[in-house]
Amino acid sequence: MKPLVLISHGDMCVELKKSVEMIMGPQDDIYTVSLLPNEGQTEFLAKFEKVVAKLDDFVVLADLYGGTPCNVIAKQIMAGANYRLYAGMNMAMVIGYLNAEMLGSKADLIAEARNGVTDVNEALQGLIDANS
């Protein structure tokens, strides 16, 4: 599996990995890098570089487009780093990535993220209307 690196403000990425593992089992190829409140861009980048130094090819998912973790890594890409960076990560996106990797196909991470957002009240109303 191509490794996945989750980056976020605070420990959102750490907790997201734990939640995914509740469903998908242990995931040795998911790595996390948290930007903690007392850290700046330099410290975050140093932690990121330490994690990815041992990886040949990987995909990065960030919590928020325009946020510091995403911006720091985007600057690396603009400077010539060669990896994919997606922002707006959610659980459906991570699980979709893992499923695609297991099947040997390419995940459409944007579609996975969008499909993970549902107005449950509207969906339930559709079921109620269909059964009336």
Where are these regions (language model features)?
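N-terminal loops that bind phosphate or other acidic moieties
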Residues: 2-132
